[in-house]
Amino acid sequence: SGNSFGDYIPYRTWKPTIVVGGEVLKPTSWHFAHEQWGGNQMQSRFLKNSKRLMTNIDYNSWVGVRIFGDAITRSKSLDSKEILTQIMDEKFNVAAYKGKPVSFRKWNGQLRQPILLVTPRALVSVSPQIGFVHPKTELDTLGIDESDTKCKFN
């Protein structure tokens, strides 16, 4: 594909078919090509301070610190039990530059977040995909739902 359209064509056609020389699509929490919902500003600030592109490990670390910072601020406490109670509260969420606030699944403690679908050089889409509905939050269309698992957070 000569790096000119292999990132885009396979995933943006009416009827997807094999494209020789195309790129591999993979899910990730962050990618340097993500620019929506303030992502470009976050990328720019990170690049200015660190002299490199942000990776998903950098992003996940930032989200973790942001979650604890917000939980401490909202609970007005440094007690670990109060912080955890705040984080696991159904109303707790954090803006994370992905268009939808991230939150935790109460039943298994998993972080609910939009997932970026990327090639090595391009953002193709952000999941959950349009049309998938859930009675509680469309972010629960990603992963295993509460009714489909015996896993419980203790």
Which sequence ranges carry the predicted segments?
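Extracytosolic ligand-binding ectodomains
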Residues: 1-154
